[in-house]
Amino acid sequence: MECFDISNVSSNHNVASMVRFVDGVPDNQNYRRYRIRTVEGQDDFASMAEVIRRRYARILKEGATVNPDAGDSQESVVETMRRLAQEGRAPITLPDLVIVDGGKGQLSSATGELQRLGLHELPIIGLAKKREEIFRPGESDPLVLSHDTGALKLLQRIRDEAHRCANNYNELLLRKRMKESLLDDCPGVSPKRKAALLSKFGSVERIRRKSAEEIAELPGISVRSAEAMLQWLNRE
């Protein structure tokens, strides 16, 4: 099973994670982390579509290099990839189940990308956190399992692991930006204020393009101090 989660705790820096479980056990070597490349702002649906596309387009590309005659086969794409994995010819097999963290919207975005890649037969579900509802393609009503079932507990475990990895990656990138930031030398900017600025705007370059009034929307920053900060950051 492979599970995807989007983390956008920073409004200008979205990331995603993919965790893989084999026989109910984390396959840590095949975890993946993604920086969202094509989406501006917070858009979970578009971000989910991007990471699904990148993950499975790459697997298909790798499979094509070991099976160049796949286009002449009567097998489906999923059947071909699983046969190659059984023969030991594919670098990594397609999962038995794809899980996306979210409800109908995330599931629809992910399903659309799988269909465009020809992976119509690849099973996929969405697991929504609030009520632990399971959404399936083509089904309007969610599936609700008893909270004490082993199946739901396994789904929750892999979903929570994907969530943990995505958030950890976002925090790692934020710490990296803080370490490298020009704000370190800016008068009147404490470490706490720097963290808030980078979390809100993403980078020094984006802060430079904001007005003092926009920056002052952050708690604890006045228009006057924002003006002084911009003057310092934009100095020649």
Residue spans for each PLM region:
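Acidic, glycine-enriched active-site microenvironments
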Residues: M1-E236
